[in-house]
């Protein structure tokens, strides 16, 4: 309710892609996995967004034109796409080694993937999904970026190109994850306290009823 058709499509496609990744946590990072996830993620949204474009674009297929996003202009799309297999392979190797914290791996993958920007649309959503796929493979909590942190997230991505470092994105990933866990702990604490108060109320009511019955 209250959603545009595009927003409804995005929710549907995102659910399908997320479900697909959940069912394939035992699979390594490959181009086949990446393209199929993109196909599901943009199955309805891509055709809706590009229905009037002169250049055709299909879900699950790499871009055929150079890309830009906001004020960021990416390089030669063919040269960038050639680097995708190496990114996936090296990320999987580091994951298998177990020598680096999964959050660092997820952040570095995301930063490099967004730099490559290999698809016509959905690169941001796909990058975040694949980062969470990496985290879930190592049984780490999901990284959810709230709208209130969107500008900080974009700034951290831009720092990679501007300052040639991903430390800001790594720091952002850790802080965002910790903040979410703290919020969940607080919510569970409140639920527990409410449950205890409810049980005490029930016991008091029962005790009052027992006292009345003895009169």
Regions found by a protein language model. Give the residues of each.
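FIC/Doc superfamily catalytic core
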Residues: 1-121, 125-215
């Amino acid at each position: 309710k209250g959603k545009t058709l595009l927003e409804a499509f995005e929710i549907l496609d995102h659910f399908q892609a997320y479900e697909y990744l959940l069912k394939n946590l035992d699979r390594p990072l490959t181009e086949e996995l990446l393209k199929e996830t993109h196909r599901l993620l943009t199955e309805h949204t891509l055709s809706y967004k590009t229905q009037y474009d002169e250049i055709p674009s299909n879900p699950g297929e790499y871009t055929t034109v150079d890309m830009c996003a906001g004020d960021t202009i990416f390089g030669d799309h063919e040269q960038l796409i050639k680097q995708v297999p190496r990114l996936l392979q090296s990320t999987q190797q580091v994951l298998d080694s177990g020598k680096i914290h999964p959050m660092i791996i997820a952040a570095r993958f995301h930063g490099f993937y967004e730099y490559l920007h290999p698809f016509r649309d959905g690169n941001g959503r796909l990058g975040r999904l694949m980062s969470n796929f990496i985290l879930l493979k190592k049984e780490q909590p999901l990284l959810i970026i709230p709208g209130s942190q969107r500008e900080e997230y974009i700034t951290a991505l831009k720092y990679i190109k501007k300052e040639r470092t991903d430390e800001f994105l790594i720091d952002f990933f850790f802080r965002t994850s910790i903040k979410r866990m703290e919020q969940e702990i607080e919510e569970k604490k409140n639920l527990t306290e409410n449950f205890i108060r409810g049980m005490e109320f029930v016991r008091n009511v029962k005790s009052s009823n027992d006292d009345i019955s003895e009169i």
